[in-house]
Curated annotation (Swiss-Prot):
Family to which this protein belongs: Belongs to the universal ribosomal protein uS10 family.
Annotated localization: Cytoplasm
Principal subcellular localization: cytoplasm
Transmembrane residue ranges: none
Phosphothreonine found at: 9
Source species of the chain: Homo sapiens (Human)
Protein origin, superkingdom: Eukaryota
PROSITE patterns (UniProt xref): RIBOSOMAL_S10
InterPro entries reported for this sequence: Ribosomal_uS10, Ribosomal_uS10_CS, Ribosomal_uS10_dom, Ribosomal_uS10_dom_sf, Ribosomal_uS10_euk/arc
N-acetylalanine: residues bearing it: 2
Residues in cross-link Glycyl lysine isopeptide (Lys-Gly) (interchain with G-Cter in ubiquitin): 4, 8
Protein name: Small ribosomal subunit protein uS10
N6-succinyllysine modifications at: 8
Length: 119
């Protein structure tokens, strides 16, 4: 069989738009908000659809322990706590553009988790 020329030009495949959720967690609020602002600014420069940052409830981890190691003396206690702050950012874009946006410098102590789903 011979190849038939139909006269049609090949159609470029559409770039797949994904729903991307970026989860940021940190113990320091200032560095967390700075990274959020940088990510959102980068997404707005690329004209992407952005939702967030959604501020999730702060988790407070508490430990109460005796001050004295030997058990002698009055019963005095130390109370320690650590607060973990969390932000969610949703983007609707191709995954290649998100790689460019997330390549910004991220503050130390901020953990970034990227989840990609089909739109």
């Amino acid at each position: 069989m011979a190849f038939k020329d139909t006269g049609k030009t090949p159609v470029e495949p559409e770039v797949a738009i994904h729903r991307i959720r970026i989860t940021l967690t940190s113990r320091n609020v200032k560095s967390l908000e700075k990274v959020c602002a940088d990510l959102i600014r980068g997404a707005k420069e690329k004209n992407l659809k952005v939702k967030g940052p959604v501020r999730m409830p702060t988790k407070t981890l508490r430990i109460t322990t005796r001050k004295t190691p030997c058990g002698e003396g009055s019963k005095t206690w130390d109370r320690f706590q650590m607060r973990i702050h969390k932000r969610l950012i949703d983007l609707h874009s191709p995954s290649e553009i998100v790689k460019q946006i997330t390549s910004i410098s991220i503050e130390p102590g901020v953990e970034v988790e990227v989840t990609i789903a089909d739109a």
